[in-house]
Amino acid sequence: MAKEKPHVNIVFIGHVDHGKSTTIGRLLFDTANIPENIIKKFEEMGEKGKSFKFAWVMDRLKEERERGITIDVAHTKFETPHRYITIIDAPGHRDFVKNMITGASQADAAVLVVAATDGVMPQTKEHAFLARTLGIGHIIVAINKMDMVDYDEKKFKQVSEQVKKLLMMLGYKDFPIIPISAWEGDNVVKKSDKMPWYNGPTLIEALDQIPEPPKPTDKPLRIPIQDVYSIKGVGTVPVGRVETGVLRVGDVVIFEPASTIFHKPIQGEVKSIEMHHEPMQEALPGDNIGFNVRGVGKNDIKRGDVAGHTNNPPTVVRPKDTFKAQIIVLNHPTAITIGYTPVLHAHTLQVAVRFEQLLAKLDPRTGNVVEENPQFIKTGDSAIVVLRPTKPMVIEPVKEIPQMGRFAIRDMGQTVAAGMVISIQKAE
């Protein structure tokens, strides 16, 4: 059997109106991956004889968005010669940040769309910081709307310089910068003849070269539980995605914070593992599995628990413990002060956490401290804070298990901040 092409998850980021949706639309249109329902609508409208026009498709997608149905960009797939690519989300979605952190899919790469007409705008910066905070290691830059600047090389160079400065400051290296016109279809899938001065890859060629994400099999086993089922003749079956490590039939696993909450080890031997209804002997990172554990009942575990090996159990932070985190405030109506208690979302858990200390305000670009012990932090600020959970929860320092160390903070139906765990302080 030939080795399957690697699967790569990408997100589209960038300032509002710089053409993220159009770029996604063009990728799908030119690779013949337009959503079924749109094609159906086209046929129903008796437009059979006419050629399927890009503008028409974009209007339909726009209508759907305005009716609150974002093209399920939420999971749009297409293929390149060497990759299966899934577009997992595009901002503008209210839950974009939360999805990026708690979504079943962590993004492997981001496409940053910047309009040649505007250059770097506030949201361009914010999304780039966010990509960094969320640990997205690979970025591709698409300078869009080249048709509106007459495909001018000078304009392209000028905007490229701004973007380069921003991304290098954030620690990104080796990122392609591609001049495109999503609307006209230049350099997205088809090479443009309007920019003879450019000889780099098209957007789809750059996507085809995204490095394959390494599977973190060498890290401790962590499986955040999404659901728990009772299956007749099998017993209790927790379901979740292996984030790190390897699970094998016969392993002994323990669940946290369940064990901490019940004051006794909720653990047992793994009797069977299944993926897509097929039994398997071992599960690797990225696998969505159901598994059965001897002696663990339906009421012992729930969504938000995490399975790990007994010799390296998941890290529990209790209400008497605290953890230090670096956050970026994305959207808070006033200011965050000590005592603020919103809800933290990480992997599959949701727990209210209290802001215990505001240690430092950082320059989001350099990470340097600009103010010690600030009185408050507000939208746009990056900060080091100390948080205390209101009930036991599992989270890991991002340096040790990055997949388990990122979180979103939500309140009033929106994502207030995104962050990562620096260290955990256990009370004796």
Swiss-Prot record:
GO molecular function: GTP binding; GTPase activity; translation elongation factor activity
Gene3D superfamilies per the UniProt record, alphabetical: P-loop containing nucleotide triphosphate hydrolases (3.40.50.300), Translation factors (2.40.30.10)
Residues covered by region (G1): 14-21
Region (G4): 144-147
Domain tr-type G: 5-215
Positions with a binding annotation for GTP: 14-21, 89-93, 144-147
Broad class of enzyme this protein falls into: hydrolase
Alphabetical UniProt keywords: Cytoplasm, Elongation factor, GTP-binding, Hydrolase, Magnesium, Metal-binding, Nucleotide-binding, Protein biosynthesis
Ranges where the record places region G3: 89-92
Residues at which Mg(2+) binds: S21
Protein's name according to its UniProt entry: Elongation factor 1-alpha
Origin species: Thermococcus onnurineus (strain NA1)
